[in-house]
Amino acid sequence: MDLLINIDVDDLEKAIAFYGTALGLRVGRRFDFGVELLGASSPIYLLVKSEGTQASPMSADLRRYRRHWTPVHLDVVVDDVGEAVGRALQAGATLEGEIRSDRWGQIATMADPFGHGLCFIQFLNRGYDEIALPDNRPR
């Protein structure tokens, strides 16, 4: 299975600049409706969708590009969470609280300039193996 990541934005050039600076991504192919960004383990497609347009034919929700909650967001694994946060802030992200530490690593919760949630994760020690249940049995 291949994974493609689509991110709705209302300002394509601003989004290209943000994701290029914050995540080190580069433009691959360009389309009438957006661009492909390369440099992550999966391609990311920035899709131009105007604010206020219907998000889905099955929903009355409208697109908005201020901070919003969604159950799906990007977690980006980085070598240095502090450096990654600095780059993202410089590019226009918002840090939502302190960088948190746990025995598995550190996490910074952020929002991109379009209100989408984004986390930076720096694994330490054995990463998520530090908190995995023995024998992978259900709790």
Predicted regions and their residues:
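Vicinal oxygen chelate
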Residues: 1-4, 26-75, 83-111, 122-139
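Conserved active-site tyrosine of GNAT-family acetyltransferases
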Residues: 15-20, 88, 115
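Short glycine-/small-residue motifs
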Residues: 117-120
